[in-house]
Curated annotation (Swiss-Prot):
GO cellular component, as recorded: cytosol
Biological function: Involved in transcription antitermination. Required for transcription of ribosomal RNA (rRNA) genes. Binds specifically to the boxA antiterminator sequence of the ribosomal RNA (rrn) operons.
InterPro entries: NusB-like_sf (IPR035926), NusB_fam (IPR011605), NusB_RsmB_TIM44 (IPR006027)
Signal sequence, renumbered to the chain: none
Presence of the UniProt keyword RNA-binding in the record: yes
Name of the protein described by the UniProt record: Transcription antitermination protein NusB
Gene name of this polypeptide: nusB
Lineage: Bacteria, Pseudomonadati, Pseudomonadota, Alphaproteobacteria, Maricaulales
Family the UniProt entry places it in: Belongs to the NusB family.
NCBIfam families hit by this protein: nusB
Pfam families: NusB
Keyword tags: RNA-binding, Transcription, Transcription antitermination, Transcription regulation
Molecular-function GO term, any one: RNA binding
A Gene Ontology biological process term: DNA-templated transcription termination
């Protein structure tokens, strides 16, 4: 893997956004499990989890503004995102029945596919497959891939 000093500006931006996406999924999980609000979790990530690489092992370098836009966007649009994700699931499944981490991935990635048209759909899908692979080794990444593929083809048919 390239180090930050050897990265091109576009590679650096992609790496920082990838970290922001992973952090946004973690933040949504923390909000749900811990019952915390978006402002508190965003503040906690900014103060205790983000930082220059090497400061401390628990710090991660991420695009903090992108992270905040994802978390705040999901919270703001959750009433639209959840039904959209529900519609992609099999008849007997609902978002609330899924694992909390899968739910967080679907919410953040779904928000990005539906409302962040500045990011190509294929990039969004690939990024959240990587996020899913960071958490799961089983069928979950394939399930998430299929859901996002259906979502993207419905929301952005011109990109396929």
């Amino acid at each position: 893997m390239a180090t930050a000093s050897k990265e091109s500006p576009s590679e650096n931006r992609a790496r920082l956004r990838r970290a922001a996406r992973l952090s946004a999924v973690q933040a949504l999980y923390q909000m749900e499990i811990g019952g915390l609000g978006a402002s508190a979790v965003i503040r906690e990530f900014r103060e205790h989890r983000f930082g220059a690489c090497g400061e401390a092992p628990e710090f991660v370098e991420a695009d903090e503004d992108f992270f905040e836009s994802l978390v705040a966007g999901v919270v703001e649009r959750q009433a639209d995102v959840d039904p959209a994700m529900d519609a992609l699931l099999a008849d007997k499944w609902r978002l609330e029945r899924l694992d909390a981490t899968v739910r967080a991935i679907l919410r953040v990635g779904g928000f990005e596919l539906l409302y962040r048209k500045d990011v190509p759909a294929r990039v969004v899908i690939d990024e959240y497959i990587e996020v899913a692979n960071a958490f799961f080794e089983g069928a979950e990444p394939k399930f998430i891939n299929a859901a996002f593929d259906r979502c993207a083809r419905g929301a952005r048919p011109d990109e396929f």
